[in-house]
Design a protein with these regions (language model features):
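NUDIX/MutT-family hydrolases
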Residues: 86-88, 97-129
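Active-site-adjacent beta-strand/loop module that shapes the phosphate/pyrophosphate-binding cleft
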Residues: 62-64, 72-95, 106
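Short secondary-structure boundary/capping segments
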Residues: 3, 11, 26, 76-79, ...
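Conserved hydrophobic "DFG−1" position in protein kinase catalytic cores
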Residues: 13-14, 21, 89-91, 107
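Conserved N-terminal beta-strand and adjoining loop/helix that marks the start
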Residues: 1-19, 40
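Generic C-terminal helix-cap and adjacent flexible tail
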Residues: 1-3, 130-136
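Conserved Nudix-box catalytic region and its N-terminal flanking loop in Nudix hydrolases
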Residues: 18-57
Length: 136
């Protein structure tokens, strides 16, 4: 049996000293939890293109991807593996997040990351960010 690989991209948008986070809306798995906005890669799509598409669809937000900061394999099983790509991006001039799927968003400083109820799958990356920014 062939193992299913599901790839997901998450945006790391750092603007004016704060990181963009979005809350999962009601009706979706893990509703109310916070995450870095993004979504699944479509067949043949790069992480950068998926990031641009997902942020446009979910937040009406135009960004320019830079580079992959972190990659994480989550919950590997014999049947399925989830790969998270955390991609740094910066907003296009004049673009601001406007949620399209009834979710909330917020901007947090690296020192505020522990105050946000993140999805468990994002926690390793949150710890990496805290270390990178010297947050204890």
């Amino acid at each position: 049996m062939k193992k299913e690989i599901v790839e997901v991209v998450a945006a790391v948008v750092f603007d004016r000293g704060k990181l963009l986070c979005s809350q999962r809306p009601e009706g979706k798995a893990h509703a109310g939890k916070w995450e870095f906005p993004g979504g699944k890669l479509e067949k043949g799509e790069t992480a950068a293109l998926a990031l641009m598409r997902e942020l446009a669809e979910e937040l009406n937000y135009r960004v320019n991807p830079l580079d992959e900061m972190y990659r994480l394999a989550v919950h590997p099983t014999p049947e399925r593996e989830l790969i998270l790509h955390f991609v740094r991006a910066y907003p296009e001039s004049g673009s601001f997040p406007e949620p399209c799927e009834n979710q909330q968003f917020c901007w947090v400083t690296p020192t505020e990351l522990d105050q946000v109820d993140f999805l468990s799958t994002d926690q390793e990356f949150v710890d990496f960010l805290k270390m990178a920014y010297g947050v204890k």
